Amino acid sequence: MNILIQLSHPAHFHLYKNAIRNYQEDGHMVFVLIKTKDILENLLQNAGIEYFNILPVAHRGSKLEILWDMIVRDWRIMRFCRKHAIDILSGSTPEVAQVAWLLGLKSINTTEDDATVIGAVIKAMQPFVKCIL
């Protein structure tokens, strides 16, 4: 099975690092996609986990710029999924839910924060998922 995991924060690395190893040990192809954030790349490099950076430079600023970055990530993830015949997506970003829905794929969506803390993320994810873990 081809599994895509998107990480957008160092906390996501700690949430997924063991699952990534377990999937690989079980013979699955695991593709890790990231956007540049704090020490995320260093954590992956130190763990020896191969990754693809789909947004090396973010435009953080206005809400419009944040929305634009999300659309860019959606597009890049969608292209990646088609190129690598992804079967299932997992992560804690709206893009995972949105792309899975658009491509008719399954997704496992997680959050590491309370919905009141990341309300905008939940609102962007909720229409596309059955459940958020």
Residue ranges and their predicted role:
Residues 1-10:
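Nucleotide-activated donor-dependent transferases that construct or modify glycoconjugates
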Residues 2, 86-88:
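Structural motif
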Residues 10-24:
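Short amphipathic alpha-helix
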